[in-house]
UniProtKB/Swiss-Prot annotation:
It comes from Legionella pneumophila subsp. pneumophila (strain Philadelphia 1 / ATCC 33152 / DSM 7513). This is Integration host factor subunit alpha. GO terms for molecular function: DNA binding; structural constituent of chromatin. One of its GO terms (cellular component) is cytosol. Keywords: DNA recombination, DNA-binding, Transcription, Transcription regulation, Translation regulation. Heterodimer of an alpha and a beta chain.
Amino acid sequence: MIVNALSKAIMAETLCDELKLNKPVAKEMVENFFEELRHALENGQHVKLSGFGNFTLRDKPQRPGRNPKTGEEIPVEARRVVTFKPGLKLKTKIEKIGK
């Protein structure tokens, strides 16, 4: 179980409180934000959020793998993955929290 996780519902509620929006509008804003991120990544674009970080696409080549139960060698197919690299501001704030 994840404790203290930020959900889309919590984000929408924060928008309601901070910007005095009604709940359906806030939920739609949050959904639209994530839909834009998904759309950009699906179209091969990188997503750069200033002060937060970058989402980039990386192509991973096929590689040999192993079935942990049988030890049988099986190929792991080539695939595209999304990676996230935190921006300097976010990194700095997270490092300060850890101290």
